Design a protein with these regions (language model features):
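Accessory, often N-terminal, substrate/partner-engagement and coupling regions
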Residues: 1-10
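Cytosolic-facing regulatory segments adjacent to core modules
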Residues: 46-47, 81-158, 172
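A broadly conserved detector of short glycine/acidic/proline-rich loop/turn motifs that flank catalytic sites
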Residues: 63, 139-140, 168
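The Walker A/P-loop phosphate-binding site
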Residues: 11-109
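Helical hairpin unit composed of two closely spaced alpha helices linked by a short loop
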Residues: 159-178
Length: 178
């Protein structure tokens, strides 16, 4: 019995990582540094910020300082550079057609005029926006319902980003009191 106990291989501890477990990744990091992340295509911003899939990004600032507009620009950049599709749960960007128009302008690169309606460029941009940007419209936004709809959009439409704007307008649970 003593010989068997001495010769037994220890069972690895759950949720514990040793240096040897990640040594290959450490060697790669020492030799190559951080792998470049995804960038939005804004030179000065890209010099200081890049992201990776699976990250949770919070954009903060004073009210009416352009946070939503900047996030929209980031999303259009990720779409242009990497083909990322995005869903928006954006209770403050109502009515939805105004937010859709903001995204269209960013994809268009300018403000389309009434003469542009139904032109070839108009139709191309509309098709692009229709297949790449999705608006989650709910009467009450709860974190659970938004994340559930986001998961559906991952499976059905292939979204890579879910924007919740503003996060403080999304309740953590379905509170019917107020």
């Amino acid at each position: 019995l003593t010989a068997r106990i001495t010769a037994a291989t220890p069972v690895p501890l759950e949720n514990v990582t040793t240096f040897r477990d990640v040594e290959g990744e450490v060697v790669d990091f020492v030799r190559n540094g951080f792998k470049p992340g995804f960038q939005v295509g804004l030179r000065n911003f890209d010099d200081i910020f890049s992201t990776y899939t699976g990250q949770f990004i919070t954009v903060t600032g004073i009210p009416s300082s352009g946070k939503s507009d900047f996030v929209d620009q980031m999303i259009v950049g990720y779409n242009k550079n990497y083909g990322w599709k995005t869903a928006f749960a954006s209770p403050e960007n109502a009515p939805t057609y105004l937010h859709a128009h903001k995204l269209m302008r960013k994809v268009w690169g300018d403000m389309p005029s009434s003469a542009d309606v139904h032109s070839d460029k108009w139709n191309d941009v509309v098709d692009h926006c229709n297949t790449n940007f999705f608006h989650i419209d709910m009467e009450r936004y709860t974190l659970e319902s938004v994340l559930k709809k986001g998961a559906e959009l991952v499976k059905r439409k292939g979204i890579k980003c879910l924007v919740i704007d503003p996060f403080n307008k999304v309740r953590s649970t379905d509170q019917s009191g107020d």
